[in-house]
């Protein structure tokens, strides 16, 4: 298993590299959003474009833009 912490990589650098890329954002509630990452701030507030909301693996809604409060975010995957 690779030890990621040995790289000493700042997560904000990773987040700035993936602006404009398709991402998956999972919330603490289990809801998943997929869309194009537009911005992330210091509080992990996230703005997505062309976003889709999934619950239990099923598409619930499609949004043009979605704004997600950072304290609800479990993880961001690119």
Swiss-Prot record:
Pfam families named in the record: LSM (PF01423)
InterPro entries (UniProt xref): Lsm6/sSmF, LSM_dom_sf, Sm, Sm_dom_euk/arc
Record key words, sorted: Cytoplasm, mRNA processing, mRNA splicing, Nucleus, Ribonucleoprotein, RNA-binding, rRNA processing, Spliceosome, tRNA processing
GO MF terms held by the record: RNA binding
Coiled coil: none
Top-level taxon in the UniProt lineage: Eukaryota
Disulfide bond entries: none
Subcellular compartments: Cytoplasm; Nucleus
GO cellular component terms attached to this protein's record: Lsm1-7-Pat1 complex; nucleolus; P-body; sno(s)RNA-containing ribonucleoprotein complex; spliceosomal complex; U4/U6 x U5 tri-snRNP complex; U6 snRNP
Domain Sm, chain residue ranges per copy: 10-78
One GO-annotated biological process of the protein: deadenylation-dependent decapping of nuclear-transcribed mRNA
Protein family membership: Belongs to the snRNP Sm proteins family. SmF/LSm6 subfamily.
Subunit structure: Component of the heptameric LSM1-LSM7 complex, which consists of lsm1, lsm2, lsm3, lsm4, lsm5, lsm6 and lsm7. Component of the heptameric LSM2-LSM8 complex, which consists of lsm2, lsm3, lsm4, lsm5, lsm6, lsm7 and lsm8. The LSm subunits form a seven-membered ring structure with a doughnut shape.
Function, as annotated: Component of LSm protein complexes, which are involved in RNA processing and may function in a chaperone-like manner, facilitating the efficient association of RNA processing factors with their substrates. Component of the cytoplasmic LSM1-LSM7 complex, which is thought to be involved in mRNA degradation by activating the decapping step in the 5'-to-3' mRNA decay pathway. Component of the nuclear LSM2-LSM8 complex, which is involved in splicing of nuclear mRNAs.
Name of the protein this chain belongs to: U6 snRNA-associated Sm-like protein LSm6
Species this protein is from: Aspergillus clavatus (strain ATCC 1007 / CBS 513.65 / DSM 816 / NCTC 3887 / NRRL 1 / QM 1276 / 107)
Biological classification of the source: Eukaryota, Fungi, Dikarya, Ascomycota, Pezizomycotina
Gene assigned in the entry: lsm6
